Swiss-Prot record:
Alphabetized PANTHER family for the sequence: DIHYDROOROTATE DEHYDROGENASE (QUINONE), MITOCHONDRIAL, DIHYDROOROTATE DEHYDROGENASE (QUINONE), MITOCHONDRIAL-RELATED
Pfam families documented for this protein: DHO_dh
GO molecular function (one): dihydroorotate dehydrogenase (quinone) activity
Assigned EC number: 1.3.5.2
HAMAP family the record matches: DHO_dh_type2
Protein name as it appears in the record: Dihydroorotate dehydrogenase (quinone)
Taxonomic source organism: Dichelobacter nodosus (strain VCS1703A)
Amino acid sequence: MNPYPHLRPLLFCLNPEIAHNLTLQILSRAAVFIPRIKAGNPIHLLGHTFPNRLGLAAGLDKNAVAISAFDRLGFGFIEVGTATPRPQSGNPKPRLFRLPEHQAIINCMGFNNDGVVALCQQVAAVKKRTRALIGINIGKNKLTPNERAADDYLIAMSTAYPYADYLAINISSPNTVGLRDLQHGAALCELLQRLKTERDKLSAVYEKTVPLLVKIAPDNEREQLDEMLSIIEDSGIDGIIATNTTLDKTAVTGHRYADEQGGLSGKPLTEKSTKIIAHIRERLPDLPLIASGGVMSADDYYAKLEAGADLVQIYSGLIYHGPQLIKDCLRMPSPQR
């Protein structure tokens, strides 16, 4: 029996951010009571063996408080964060909106988090008994100007490095002013070069190489996207996560929340993100690629794999469909390529 259809109306009666935080609190306290799901076909990627191809996207468990619960629910990997060097409260509330008619969410959270040190303490407490791999998503603080953004990423990376199975470089959130400017041209080149250089030093110190992946936005013009892909390829960065939320709210025009600031996720992002995955795979056939965006069903999950993704993450789909979506995705066959 799937209880989530009965629980969802109760959760949706609450303010979205309150419901989100309450759910995380319950999961963090009740993890030991969740039956462990052992499902999926392992895949070797990024120097690791992932238990399966399905992961939790960053943003749901920003402070890594419910890793054990998500691990027991069956995820093959869990991406926590976004974590910044210093704690920050994020953007003013309200900043999270549900659009059930569209199976969508708009968020303008603004990297609210307890800081990378606190997150790493949470990861360290559970990592040895966690089956899923753990990715740590890092970003810059709101008050750090773009000219010094690399310093923030370097601080976060060096702090998180011992605890991460991979690190995700978030330069694509629409909710930190100017952040997406780091996706282009000289700014992207410099950032990736500095991160790669520091990663090589950390690899020697810790005697392990933690893969670096860049998380990109879905709103780039094709020429911009191709420029980004060329820079990423030349940089030696290990992979791409595509995509973050979109600023294009055409699909929800007329909804009472359509004009809210922030990024749109969920079903309206499904087709756009899948097309970007296919384009990236065509351009970079061998680069590890994680799909994120608009996975609302097992068919969406499989479509991302068919488009060329190696791994797939969910977030909004979990809000609308609950843990049953995890089971449905893990029942899907591996793609034939």
